[in-house]
């Protein structure tokens, strides 16, 4: 089980990323646009650097929603590999069965 402070930090980062997502995407679009001049790009870069560091989605970490485990997390379910197996074996995830060949 991960420390609650680390899990809460990641949740807080998710909220900040969602809050600034549109603003960040607009600024990045200006930077990638070939038609915008140097002045527009420099102001966009300065505004982008002025955004909070935690507003970047790169700083997020996929974690298991039950245990907070940072590695071995399946995005589709939001669960770590261990909890996914436990829940799937109990038949609580519809459509998931144990492979047999």
Swiss-Prot record:
Enumerate the GO terms in the molecular function aspect: rRNA binding; structural constituent of ribosome
Superkingdom classification of source: Bacteria
Answer yes or no on keyword Ribonucleoprotein.
yes
Q: Which UniProt keywords apply?
A: Ribonucleoprotein, Ribosomal protein, RNA-binding, rRNA-binding
Q: Which GO terms describe its biological process?
A: translation
Coiled-coil ranges from the UniProt annotation: none
Under the heading InterPro entries, the entry gives: Ribosomal_uS14 (IPR001209), Ribosomal_uS14_bac/plastid (IPR023036)
Its biological function? Answer: Binds 16S rRNA, required for the assembly of 30S particles and may also be responsible for determining the conformation of the 16S rRNA at the A site.
Q: How does it assemble?
A: Part of the 30S ribosomal subunit. Contacts proteins S3 and S10.
Family, as annotated: Belongs to the universal ribosomal protein uS14 family.
Protein name from the UniProt record? Small ribosomal subunit protein uS14
Query: In the record, what lineage is assigned to the organism producing the protein?
Result: Bacteria, Pseudomonadati, Pseudomonadota, Betaproteobacteria, Nitrosomonadales
